[in-house]
């Protein structure tokens, strides 16, 4: 097939290419698809309704029409990135300092500060630009997807790759990826409020054709079209793409909305005509927003905002401190005071922190992609490290999502078993065997049951009727096609995994949907709904004209609709009985006991029912009447095996201090069996009290019936909630929050969006998740795998740990410099002014140049081996970090101060010169002693800062014993550990060496850095650097002693058992209550 067009400019010129009347085209040459039949639209777009476009056809059309996006709405704004670099408190402090320095004609300090500002902005710009590109590509991975048919195969592609002519399938929760001419649907309704303003969903009809060209049809009345960006609120449908990107109806609106963003707050007009107060409130709010945006305290991640507030607080605190100490008592607020205020303020501002944080998060987001995790919101990177409870769905997340029908029970017939089949799509694989006993009887008997290899022939009538219901209450399809790569015939399936499993089972017995559907007319369908957990289809036989309802769903929900069945006895007297019996409560208990027998095997059990419709006047749109007075037919047990890695991941979560909760729509028995198999529930429930066992596994009805106070009094929140509804998930999150938990919640359906937003971290499924769920989530799993959640948490903890490391390193240096400079106020020269023990340029060099690169490299440290065995931590600024920051900073300041004092005062009466704080008046002879002291203390502080970077790798372990479990001698292990992060190694090494040229290069040393060459002072700098290292090691040794004492207090037999058994804390050593209740035991 040829492409629709040869270039974009001709994409609307269909007149020369199709055999259709010109009246079917609008004024601009685009197709008015709502006025055409399905066949005409398919011909215009040169597509096949069954097989869709070919791959080559789709690729060429994509080149011709471009990507299916609304233009450059997500285009990276270079202006905004630059503004973001300038408008944060830390950069603004540097800019203010630069302006002050230039205003008092300290040109060199002002120029150096300006250069540092330029470097910060440049590095920040490059990194944020890269981060924006990375996040843009990640957002495109998690953006709405479309399920299309190409080459006869159903495949999921990014919505932006959809092209005109594609056959697109939509279902509940999907965002329509493009404008569609509907060709097939069932109870399809879409929410078009975004487009038309209509608050109610619009019911679609693909058979409508508006061929009267004299009557204009408004957009909202074109019921045979589905529009891009509308959300499917009910049913399902299939359509041909007729417009993409800006050619869609929503695209036309997008054009008109361009450049309509405003930072101006709107005036509140909700109470009628606004008064002066409303205008004043809007004006003041606008000014506040602009001011806060400039300072960067209401943009960025929570940590970035905290750092901006910290910068503002420290800057003004230091300013007033310096003014008071150096100027106000003497009424001498002059240039010297201003310069010293600048110097101290700079020493307190971690100038490189924002840049380092941005780079770390951008790299972390890229690492997440390799672990099948897409980060949609950077805030979630900070939150992941603090997760201590995960609420996960079962199907497809904890399990493989590849369902295979294993057992079927037909009352008064027996149990059918499928064996030797692990191919979920191939109806020819495996063997179906039979025994005329119920699952309950098989479970209770001690005898070995011999399943017959031959099926009853002919099939019992009740089994035939059940097969018919299983086939028709099902929209999954199977087909065999030739694989393009291997050329072999392979089985392919389209539809829901559960329905595919049922369809494969019926096809094994020659009851495939394709062979039966041509004999029936599909009259109505009521799709599966998570609130009622069943679906029904209404068909009319073309041979007998008989109308029948076919229903399947959760056993208890289907039984509630049933009034009759054919009975059941464990003997041959009523074999294949055709006489209807009223369904009594005892009968329902019997059916439920058979369901339990299947569910305890880990099978997901569904029930089937049917009824004849004899009243021709019945309303086929009334679901309640259609699904009433049904005849129960039988059960099917579907096995969805756990993923091989799930059990190990759950165990790792328990070791990491993370509780795992399964919130599933399955039957309690199935949920409990799978939960025990993967380790969410303990196997031996008799170890626990009756109260705890009841709380561990509950149904949604039981949980929802409890008040908040009753939930809070439970000994443990449920580890498994079966038959879970969307509102149950929200209540579970609220209950966890009340217990101070930090919660991650998984979801895939449109109804999961409230719980995803409520959770601290919302996790959507990338493969089977709806677009609405993805949009509400913080992260998206590209493989729908529970193990990927653990990977995300591990990476989140690594990032949080690394952020703590470089925050500690940078802020400890700030503390050291601030203390050092504040004490330096005591050094008075001959003019009565304080002498800087460090010059402003030295301060900036240490903070920005020397420390920035080691900090960035600390951000890339590998996770420690035991990171998942540590307790969750939801904050960066822990008391341990704060105390470490003060201790390291204080000790560094002491080392530098003593070094300076020894040099200046060691030779007797010191001479601190005159105006040694100004580059313009510096004199090497007058200020020689001060310059030598500065050089030595500068070298000491630089080397101490670099040593601190290595010390921050591990909060407790010695620099010489980073890894305790090694057979290497200490010196060899130290080399291995330091070389492990080669970027950090070379940053530190180059930082050590860089001190020498800065001290010795003429002009730069005396005019810029305000220090001079030194000799024996190098020995002092080396000695005090080693002293700092020794003090740091001593502090870590004290911390290790304290930690060991704390652990000894915690160590006892129960503690050790709890480490190996995460459920030990729930154990009751009085087992009588539970053992007296067999139904609580497994």
Curated annotation (Swiss-Prot):
InterPro entries: ATPase_P-typ_cation-transptr_C (IPR006068), ATPase_P-typ_cation-transptr_N (IPR004014), ATPase_P-typ_cyto_dom_N (IPR023299), ATPase_P-typ_P_site (IPR018303), ATPase_P-typ_TM_dom_sf (IPR023298), ATPase_P-typ_transduc_dom_A_sf (IPR008250), HAD-like_sf (IPR036412), HAD_sf (IPR023214). Its cofactor is Mg(2+). Its main location: membrane. The chain crosses the membrane at residues 76-96, 99-119, 309-329, 337-357, 808-828, 833-853, 885-905, 936-956, 984-1004, 1008-1028. Its EC number is 7.2.2.3. SUPFAM superfamilies: Calcium ATPase, transduction domain A (SSF81653), Calcium ATPase, transmembrane domain M (SSF81665), HAD-like (SSF56784), Metal cation-transporting ATPase, ATP-binding domain N (SSF81660). Induction: Induced by high pH. Not induced in response to sodium ions. GO terms for molecular function: ATP binding; ATP hydrolysis activity; metal ion binding; P-type potassium:proton transporter activity. The active site is phosphorylated in presence of sodium or potassium and in conditions of higher pH. Not phosphorylated in presence of calcium ions. Pfam families: Cation_ATPase (PF13246), Cation_ATPase_C (PF00689), Cation_ATPase_N (PF00690), E1-E2_ATPase (PF00122), Hydrolase (PF00702). The active site is at residue 393. One of its GO terms (biological process) is potassium ion export across plasma membrane. Catalyzes the hydrolysis of ATP coupled with the export of sodium and potassium from the cell. May be an inefficient sodium exporter. May transport other cations such as lithium. Sodium/potassium efflux ATPases are involved in salt tolerance and maintaining the membrane potential across the plasma membrane in high salinity (Na+) or alkaline (K+) environments. This is Sodium/potassium exporting P-type ATPase 2. The lineage of its organism: Eukaryota, Fungi, Dikarya, Ascomycota, Saccharomycotina.
């Amino acid at each position: 097939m040829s492409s629709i067009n040869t270039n974009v400019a001709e994409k609307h010129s269909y007149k020369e290419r199709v055999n259709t009347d010109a009246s079917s085209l609008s004024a601009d040459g685009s197709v008015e698809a709502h006025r055409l039949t399905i066949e005409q639209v398919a011909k215009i777009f040169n597509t096949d309704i069954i097989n869709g476009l070919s791959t080559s056809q789709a690729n060429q059309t994509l080149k011709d029409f471009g990507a299916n996006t609304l233009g450059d709405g997500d285009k990276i704004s270079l202006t905004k990135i630059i503004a973001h670099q300038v408008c944060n408190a830390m950069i603004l402090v540097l800019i203010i300092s630069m302006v002050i320095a230039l205003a008092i004609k300290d040109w060199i300090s002002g120029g150096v500060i300006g250069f540092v500002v330029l470097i910060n902005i440049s590095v920040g710009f490059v990194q944020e630009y890269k981060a924006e590109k990375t996040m843009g590509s990640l957002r495109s991975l998690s953006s709405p997807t479309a399920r299309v048919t190409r080459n006869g195969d159903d495949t999921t592609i990014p919505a932006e790759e959809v092209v005109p002519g594609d056959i697109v399938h939509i279902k509940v929760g999907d965002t329509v990826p493009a404008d569609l001419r509907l060709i097939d649907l069932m109870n399809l309704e879409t929410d078009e409020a975004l487009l038309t303003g209509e608050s109610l969903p619009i019911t679609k009809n693909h058979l409508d054709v508006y061929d009267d060209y004299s009557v204009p049809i408004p957009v909202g009345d074109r019921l045979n079209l589905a529009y891009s960006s509308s959300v499917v609120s009910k049913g399902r449908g299939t359509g041909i793409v007729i417009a993409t990107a800006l050619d869609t109806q929503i695209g036309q609106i997008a054009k008109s909305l361009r450049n309509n963003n405003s930072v101006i707050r709107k005036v509140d007009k909700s109470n009628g005509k606004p008064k002066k107060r409303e205008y004043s409130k809007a004006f003041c709010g606008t000014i506040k927003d602009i001011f806060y945006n400039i300072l960067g305290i209401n943009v960025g991640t929570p940590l970035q905002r905290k750092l901006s507030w910290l910068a503002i607080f420290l800057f003004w605190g230091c300013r007033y401190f310096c003014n008071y100490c150096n100027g106000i008592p003497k009424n001498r607020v002059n240039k010297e005071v201003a310069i010293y205020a600048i110097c101290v303020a700079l020493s307190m501002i971690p100038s490189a922190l924002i840049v380092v944080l941005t780079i770390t998060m951008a790299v972390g987001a890229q690492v997440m992609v390799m672990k099948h995790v897409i980060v949609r919101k950077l805030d979630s990177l900070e939150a992941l490290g603090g997760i201590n409870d995960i609420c996960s769905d079962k199907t497809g997340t904890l399990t493989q999502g590849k369902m295979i029908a294993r057992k079927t029970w037909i009352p008064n017939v027996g149990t059918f078993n499928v064996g030797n089949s692990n191919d979920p799509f191939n109806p020819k694989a495996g063997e179906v065997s039979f025994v005329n006993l119920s699952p309950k009887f098989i479970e209770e008997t001690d005898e070995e049951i011999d399943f017959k290899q031959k099926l009853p022939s002919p099939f019992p009538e009740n089994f035939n009727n059940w097969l018919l219901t299983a086939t028709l209450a099902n929209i999954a399809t199977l087909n065999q096609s030739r694989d393009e790569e291997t050329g072999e015939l392979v089985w392919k399936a389209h539809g829901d995994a559960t329905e595919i499993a049922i369809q494969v089972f019926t096809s094994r017995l020659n009851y495939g949907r394709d062979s039966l559907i041509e004999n029936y007319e599909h009259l109505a369908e009521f799709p599966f709904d998570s609130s009622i957990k069943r679906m029904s289809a209404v068909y009319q036989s073309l041979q007998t004209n008989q109308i029948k309802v076919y229903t399947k769903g959760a056993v208890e929900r289907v039984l509630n609709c049933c009034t009759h069945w054919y009975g059941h006895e464990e003997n041959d007297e009523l074999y294949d009985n055709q006489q209807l019996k009223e369904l009594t409560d005892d009968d329902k208990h019997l059916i439920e006991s058979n369901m339990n027998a299947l569910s305890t095997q880990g099978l997901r059990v569904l029930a089937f029912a049917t009824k004849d419709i004899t009243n021709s006047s019945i309303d086929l749109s009334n679901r309640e009447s259609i699904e009433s007075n049904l005849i129960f037919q039988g059960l099917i047990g579907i096995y969805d095996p756990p993923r091989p890695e799930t059990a190990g991941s759950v165990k790792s979560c328990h070791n990491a201090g993370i509780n795992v909760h399964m919130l599933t729509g399955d039957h309690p028995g199935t949920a409990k069996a799978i939960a025990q198999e993967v380790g969410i529930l303990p196997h031996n429930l008799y170890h626990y009290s009756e109260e705890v066992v009841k709380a561990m596994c509950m149904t949604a009805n039981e949980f929802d019936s409890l008040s908040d106070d009753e939930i809070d009094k439970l000994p443990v929140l449920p580890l498994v909630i079966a038959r879970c509804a969307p509102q149950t998930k929200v209540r579970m999150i609220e209950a966890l929050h009340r217990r101070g938990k930090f919660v991650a919640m998984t979801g895939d359906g449109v109804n999961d969006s409230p719980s995803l937003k409520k959770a601290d971290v919302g996790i959507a499924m990338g493969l089977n998740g709806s677009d609405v769920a993805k949009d509400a989530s913080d992260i998206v799993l590209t493989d729908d795998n529970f193990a990927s959640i653990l990977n995300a948490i591990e990476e989140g903890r690594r990032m949080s740990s690394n952020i703590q490391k470089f925050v500690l390193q940078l802020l400890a240096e700030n503390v050291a410099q601030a203390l050092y400079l504040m004490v330096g106020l005591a050094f008075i020269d001959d003019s009565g002014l304080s002498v800087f023990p460090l010059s402003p340029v030295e301060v900036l060099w240490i903070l920005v140049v020397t420390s920035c690169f080691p900090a960035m490299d600390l951000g890339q440290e590998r996770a420690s081996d035991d990171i998942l065995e540590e307790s969750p931590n939801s904050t960066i600024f822990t008391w341990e970090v704060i105390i470490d920051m003060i201790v390291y900073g204080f000790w560094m300041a002491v080392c530098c101060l003593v070094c300076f004092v020894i040099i200046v005062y060691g030779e007797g009466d010191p001479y601190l010169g005159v105006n040694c704080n100004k580059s313009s008046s510096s004199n090497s002879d007058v200020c020689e002693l001060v310059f030598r002291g500065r050089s030595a203390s500068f070298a000491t502080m630089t080397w101490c800062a670099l040593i601190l970077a290595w010390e921050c790798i591990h909060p407790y372990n010695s620099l010489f014993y980073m890894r305790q479990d090694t057979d290497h001698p200490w010196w060899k292990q130290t080399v291995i550990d330091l070389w492990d992060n080669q970027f950090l190694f070379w940053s530190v090494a180059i930082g050590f060496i860089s001190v020498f040229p800065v001290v010795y290069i003429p002009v730069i040393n005396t005019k810029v850095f305000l220090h001079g060459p030194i000799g024996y002072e190098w020995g002092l700098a080396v000695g005090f650097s080693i002293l700092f290292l020794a003090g740091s090691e001593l502090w870590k040794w004290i911390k290790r002693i304290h930690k060991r004492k704390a652990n000894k207090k915690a160590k006892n037999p129960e503690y050790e058992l709890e480490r190996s058994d995460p459920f030990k804390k729930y154990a009751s050593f009085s087992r009588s209550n539970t053992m007296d209740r067999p139904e609580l035991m497994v």
